[in-house]
Design a protein with these regions (language model features):
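Core catalytic region of metal-dependent phosphoesterases/phosphodiesterases
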Residues: 14, 19-111
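Short, conserved loop/helix-junction motifs that constitute active-site signature segments
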Residues: 30-31, 59-67, 152-153, 213-217, ...
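Active-site environment of divalent metal-dependent phosphoester hydrolases
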Residues: 18-24, 43-47, 73-84, 107-109, ...
Length: 252
């Protein structure tokens, strides 16, 4: 799916929302004519459909008054079914809150300066302790792109994702899982034997996607959430930005 927002002057990325929804919305009121892109974990689909739609209608009022758009990719704490192209929630938003878009995986957002690839999903490290389809979702992980994806996309400037490739913060893995230096993940892995390998494989998938696209066209930015910390680094002349919870980051 391609989404054209080339008329908006400002581009701002938002870190995980979680419990800071009011703070984030209050910050958004400081901007007009702005395209906001959320890196996920807005808890969409965790509570009832009606609870979500009530919240969206309130945010829609603010966005409409500011002539702004909010695009949301899915995190591991969002229900993946709501981000499908023909989902009931996407249909509701189209008819009742058109300034809010739940972005399907591997959609491309076009702005006046950038082509932005959106990749949702991530593994929950505490999944074995959570309730399926309430606190975590079985298909929460990053999905592989379609076979023809790389043939159709050769001019991506920014990748926005929920998780991060292996080469970006946090640098948890050495070669082939010989060493893993995340205390918190190692703690959960005592009760979840496939956790470390599952995380490794999805971050390796992101790395592979980046490398194939970057070989065709230089990726200027890699922007992501999930890790709840602001860290900036460089890889192959790509600026990698990990966003804090509730952080707004403007890209010129």
């Amino acid at each position: 799916m391609t989404l054209d927002f080339s008329t908006y002057k400002n581009l701002i990325f938002i870190g995980d929302v979680h419990h800071k929804l009011n703070d984030v919305v209050n910050q958004m009121t400081n901007y007009s004519n702005t395209l906001f892109i959320s890196t996920g974990d807005c808890s969409i689909g965790v509570k009832s459909f009606e609870t979500d739609t009530d919240i969206f209608e309130k945010i829609e009022y603010i966005l409409a008054s500011q002539n702004s758009i909010l695009c949301i990719i899915r995190g591991n704490h969002d229900n993946p079914k709501y981000f499908k192209k023909n989902s009931s929630m996407r249909s509701f938003l189209e008819n009742n809150a058109p300034h809010i878009i739940l972005v399907p995986d591997y959609s491309v957002i076009k702005t006046s300066n950038y082509n932005i690839l959106c990749i949702g999903g991530a593994r929950s490290i505490d999944r074995v302790f959570n309730v399926k389809n309430l606190d975590w979702f079985q298909n929460e992980n990053i999905q592989k792109p379609d076979d023809n994806f790389f043939n159709q996309n050769d001019d991506i400037d920014i990748i926005v994702s929920h998780s991060a490739p292996l080469f970006a913060y946090p640098l948890e893995f050495s070669d082939e899982l010989k060493f893993y230096n995340s205390f918190i993940v190692n703690s959960y892995a005592l009760y979840d034997k496939t956790l470390k390998n599952d995380i490794y494989k999805e971050r390796l998938l992101l790395k592979g996607i980046y490398e194939k696209l970057n070989n065709k066209h230089h990726i200027q930015y890699l922007i992501y959430g999930h890790y709840h910390k602001h860290i900036e680094s460089q890889y192959n002349k790509t600026k990698c930005i990990s966003l804090e919870i509730g952080e707004l980051k403007q890209i010129n």
